[in-house]
Amino acid sequence: MIISTTDKIPGYKIKEITGIVMGNIVHSKHLGKDIAAAFKTLAGGEIKSYTEMMTEARNKAIERMIDEAEKLGADAIVSVRFSSSAIMSGAAEILVYGTAVKLLPKDI
């Protein structure tokens, strides 16, 4: 599955748009790690547990979007965008969405 933030894939032309696809997840941290992160904010610097949480959540949201595209028979997802929002303290929603398409090589 080709995934791109652009609306075109080099070397291919879009044969068919199969639909809008998305994946989302609301992810939270373990209470103990949340408390440790609160202390880290006092000292400043990166809060690695939250960075890891957001990376994990983003990857899971992408997997879910790909699953939707595969169900539609798509070869690629173009115009991919990400959105995140805080749901509550220590929990965030990640939404990823794009347009699922079928491709043809440009020389055909």
Swiss-Prot record:
HAMAP family: UPF0145 (MF_00338)
Cited Pfam families: YbjQ_1
Taxonomic superkingdom: Bacteria
InterPro entries noted in UniProt: UPF0145_dom_sf, UPF0145_YbjQ-like
Name the record gives this protein: UPF0145 protein Tmel_1129
Organism, as annotated: Thermosipho melanesiensis (strain DSM 12029 / CIP 104789 / BI429)
Family: Belongs to the UPF0145 family.
